[in-house]
Amino acid sequence: MSDFEQLFAGKLPKLIMFDLDGTLVDSVPDLAVAVDTMLAELGRPTAGLESVRAWVGNGAPVLVRRALANNLDHSGVDEALAERGLDIFMRAYAEKHEFTVVYPGVRETLKWLQKMGVEMALITNKPERFVAPLLDEMKLGRFFRWIIGGDTMPQKKPDPAALFFVMKMAGVPASQSLFVGDSRSDVQAAKAAGVACVALSYGYNHGRPIAEENPAMVIDDLRRLIPGCLDLDAEILLPDIKRPSSRESIVVVTRKLWMKVIKALARWRWRA
């Protein structure tokens, strides 16, 4: 029995929400360059690739604080120093993404899902200002109907607010939705939203095997998600999906738009 058959009784979900860093793209090399630039400018030892790989996943402010602490525990970092470090990091990271790469199988799988009429959204903790340019550089933006950054809404993952928002906008219930990510925050957000979560084994989870977070399924290649995803004649039952005559506009959710719908989502507010 295939992965999707296990989760959705032989059908495709109507909506799939994806994380970005560590799920679709490996961005750690560029993040590490920006972190080391920040540390060097502050007169501190550089961190290096593997340390940064263990620190990413909770947004830029947390990454900067962890780098300043040289530890996952950043509770003792001075607030003024953290703000200064964040400004330097944001400036350095905005300059280029020359070392970021798309993981194998990602484009093929997204193309297949798009052909099958599955709605797709991107929900990331990466600051909003970096998301669209990176997607354009990687040629991934056209696959997503909704794109939400880490500072787009008042909450970020593991809070499930963004998942609830996308499901409401898509008109798709949690039972017909899937979240695909690579970290504890992704799994927790999906569980809190009542959505099945498939996790990638190759991503960023602070050095812990993602299986320890108990997602519904762990895979090592996105192409494993769908049987025959490279075979456009694969026989998979599809839900009743209204296919647009032409691809509808991508909706990049911004903070301004979010404030217009926050009241509608209030009843779903997650409480830890």
From Swiss-Prot:
The organism's place on the tree of life at top rank: Bacteria
Keywords from the named record: Carbohydrate metabolism, Hydrolase, Magnesium, Metal-binding
InterPro entries (alphabetical): HAD-like_hydrolase_sf, HAD-like_sf, HAD-SF_hydro_IA, HAD_2, HAD_sf, PGP-like_dom2, PGPase_prok
GO biological process, one term: glycolate biosynthetic process
GO molecular function: metal ion binding; phosphoglycolate phosphatase activity
Catalytic activity: 2-phosphoglycolate + H2O = glycolate + phosphate
Keyword Protein transport assigned: no
GO cellular component: cytosol
Cofactor: Mg(2+)
This protein's pathway: Organic acid metabolism; glycolate biosynthesis; glycolate from 2-phosphoglycolate: step 1/1
EC supergroup of this enzyme: hydrolase
Keyword Magnesium included in the entry's annotation: yes
Gene3D superfamilies in UniProt: HAD superfamily/HAD-like, Putative phosphatase, domain 2
Entry EC number(s): 3.1.3.18
Active site residues of this protein: 19 (nucleophile)
Alphabetical list of Pfam families matching this protein: HAD_2
Binding site for Mg(2+): 19, 21, 182
Stated family: Belongs to the HAD-like hydrolase superfamily. CbbY/CbbZ/Gph/YieH family.
Functional description taken from the UniProt entry: Specifically catalyzes the dephosphorylation of 2-phosphoglycolate. Is involved in the dissimilation of the intracellular 2-phosphoglycolate formed during the DNA repair of 3'-phosphoglycolate ends, a major class of DNA lesions induced by oxidative stress.
PANTHER family noted in UniProt: PHOSPHOGLYCOLATE PHOSPHATASE
Protein name, entry field: Phosphoglycolate phosphatase
Taxonomic placement: Bacteria, Pseudomonadati, Pseudomonadota, Gammaproteobacteria, Pseudomonadales
